[in-house]
């Protein structure tokens, strides 16, 4: 007896084959090319209908994962016979799982079984009564959409793909803006070259071109909305004595078109930056509190997803973005890099050169905790309290290393000694007596002698330290010299021994040759 398990969008169909050895005969499978032959060969033994669309999704996911669901197990247990029967399935993983159940089935899953399933699915509506092709197509489409949604696990609040695309677009916009601004300055510079030296902001430069047009209009237009009053006066003065060439209306139209592009791109870039900031606060608020929205977004984009970043250890997060330098260092056996993308975080930027590596390591450890909290804590709200607590710890660590409070711009240490303010003593007229003067002089002399003694003690200490250092250096030089002499002696001795061995060998060879001749 041979059964074929066919999974349909409507339910499980267990078909009984008229030929017991159909899976072994390639000719029989090849002959299943018409409806009559398929209907004659297979009959419906049992059909287990899915209860709902959600149930259908669960059953299909179980098949994909190679698991036997309760419905399928019940169907197979009800269908088992006294004699051992053959069960043909399409999925090898599912076949292994059915074998482990210990039912009275010999499970077969090979290339021939796939051809068999292909023939059955082609004429499935005719094999299953009450199921037409249109209904089957509708069920297949609905189930396919359900599987797609399940795999994507779509959530409007947890889509890190939006962050990845936004940060990539932001980088592209920056490059385009720089290119367009440079081209605009070079183009309009032929007409008004002095303007580029006075206006460094590209957007302000483009807005001036759109407002003013040719430089002769500078005295008539109002640029107070774009520039401060002082710079506006400088621009108008420079326009009157400019050394630039004249341009036509057609030239100006094209330059203005480029300037409009720059202004529009800048406005869109600002909007995109705000969008990215809001997305980061919704998806990874604690990571944003630690490293900022731009650096956090670059972390997620580089790792591929928020989950991948959360699974990464702190050491990986620390050097994320410096993979080329890392592998180059490993290849050449040099020092590995201390930081990657994390170098652009504000906390690392505040640290001095010698402390940057330490702060990068500390920040990476706390950022790893924050991103795991963002990713895996299901009960968390959108607050960034956990990230702010961690940031405070990193800031206190930075303050200890730098010796100053890094939360302020002041570079003066806050641990200064207290200043005692004492009242000035009133003048004592009795102190004018000669004895008092003498006593005062003697006190001054004593203080002077004490100062001299302190200075002499300092000199002695310095002298002793210097002598110790010189003795140590002499000792090291002597040891090096002795080692060198010993090495030279051993090398000479080894050379003499080698020469003696070679001479003895030569003598032996000569003797042996002489004895052979005799």
UniProtKB/Swiss-Prot annotation:
Q: Name one GO molecular function term.
A: snoRNA binding
SMART domains given for it? Answer: NOSIC
One cellular component term (GO) for this entry is: nucleolus
| Residue spans of biased composition, Acidic residues class | 440-451
User: What sequence ranges are listed for the domain Nop?
Assistant: 283-403
- Answer yes or no on keyword Nucleus: yes
Q: Where is the composition biased (Basic residues)?
A: 462-484, 507-518
Q: Does the keyword rRNA processing apply?
A: yes
- Compositionally biased tracts (Basic and acidic residues): 452-461, 485-506
Domain of life from the UniProt record = Eukaryota
Name its cellular compartments.
Nucleus, Nucleolus
* Biological processes per GO annotation: rRNA processing
Return the InterPro entries for the record. Nop56/Nop58 (IPR045056), NOP58/56_N (IPR012974), Nop_C (IPR042239), Nop_dom (IPR002687), Nop_dom_sf (IPR036070), NOSIC (IPR012976)
- Chain intervals for the UniProt region annotation (Disordered): 400-518
* Major localisation: nucleus
Keywords for this entry? Nucleus, Ribonucleoprotein, Ribosome biogenesis, rRNA processing
Stated family: Belongs to the NOP5/NOP56 family.
What PANTHER family does the annotation carry? Answer: NUCLEOLAR PROTEIN 5 NUCLEOLAR PROTEIN NOP5 NOP58, NUCLEOLAR PROTEIN 58
Describe its function. Answer: Required for pre-18S rRNA processing. May bind microtubules.
Q: What is this protein called?
A: Nucleolar protein 58
Specify the species: Lodderomyces elongisporus (strain ATCC 11503 / CBS 2605 / JCM 1781 / NBRC 1676 / NRRL YB-4239) (Yeast)
What lineage is on file? Eukaryota, Fungi, Dikarya, Ascomycota, Saccharomycotina
């Amino acid at each position: 007896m041979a059964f074929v398990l066919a999974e349909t969008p409507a339910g499980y169909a267990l078909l009984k084959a008229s030929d017991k050895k159909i899976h072994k005969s390639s000719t029989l499978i090849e002959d299943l090319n018409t409806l009559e032959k398929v209907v004659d060969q297979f009959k419906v033994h049992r059909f287990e209908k899915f209860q709902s669309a959600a149930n259908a999704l669960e059953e299909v996911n179980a098949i994909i994962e190679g698991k036997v669901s309760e419905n399928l197990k019940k169907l197979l247990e009800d269908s088992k016979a006294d004699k051992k029967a053959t069960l043909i399935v399409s999925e090898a993983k599912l076949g292994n799982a059915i074998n482990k159940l210990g039912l009275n089935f010999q499970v077969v899953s090979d290339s021939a079984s796939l051809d068999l399933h292909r023939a059955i699915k082609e004429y499935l509506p005719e094999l299953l009564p009450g199921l037409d092709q249109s209904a089957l197509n509708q069920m297949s489409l609905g189930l396919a959409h359900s599987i797609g949604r399940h795999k994507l696990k779509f959530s409007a609040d947890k889509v890190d793909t939006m962050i990845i695309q936004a940060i990539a677009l932001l980088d592209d916009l920056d490059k385009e803006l720089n290119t367009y601004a440079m081209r605009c300055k070079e183009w309009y510079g032929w007409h008004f070259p002095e303007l580029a030296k006075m206006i460094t902001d590209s957007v302000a430069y483009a807005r001036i071109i759109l407002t003013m047009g040719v430089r002769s209009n500078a005295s008539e237009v109002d640029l107070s909305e774009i520039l401060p009053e002082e710079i506006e006066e400088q621009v108008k003065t420079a326009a009157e004595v400019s050394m630039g060439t004249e341009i036509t209306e057609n030239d100006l139209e094209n330059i203005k078109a480029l300037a409009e592009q720059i202004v529009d791109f800048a406005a869109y870039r600002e909007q995109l930056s705000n969008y990215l900031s809001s997305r980061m606060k919704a998806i990874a608020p604690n990571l944003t509190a630690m490293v900022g929205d731009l650096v956090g977004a670059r972390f997620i984009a580089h790792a591929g997803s928020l989950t991948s970043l959360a699974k990464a250890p702190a050491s990986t997060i620390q050097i994320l973005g410096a993979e080329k330098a890392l592998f180059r260092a490993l290849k050449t056996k040099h020092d590995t890099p201390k930081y990657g993308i994390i170098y652009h975080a504000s906390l690392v930027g505040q640290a001095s050169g010698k402390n940057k590596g330490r702060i990068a390591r500390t920040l990476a450890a706390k950022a790893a905790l924050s991103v795991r909290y963002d990713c895996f804590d299901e009960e968390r709200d959108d607050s960034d309290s956990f990230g702010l607590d961690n940031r405070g710890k990193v800031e206190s660590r930075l303050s200890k290393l730098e010796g100053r409070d890094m939360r302020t711009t002041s570079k003066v240490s806050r641990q200064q000694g207290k200043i005692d303010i004492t009242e000035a003593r009133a003048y004592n007229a009795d102190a004018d007596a000669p004895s008092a003067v003498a006593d005062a002089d003697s006190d001054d002399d004593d203080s002077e002698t004490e100062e001299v003694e302190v200075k002499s003690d300092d000199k002695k200490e310095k002298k002793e330290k210097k002598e110790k250092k010189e003795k140590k250096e002499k000792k090291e030089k002597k040891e090096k010299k002795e080692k060198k002499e010993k090495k030279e002696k051993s090398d000479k001795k080894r050379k003499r021994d080698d020469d003696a061995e070679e001479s003895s060998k030569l003598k032996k060879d000569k003797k042996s040759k002489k004895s052979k001749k005799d």
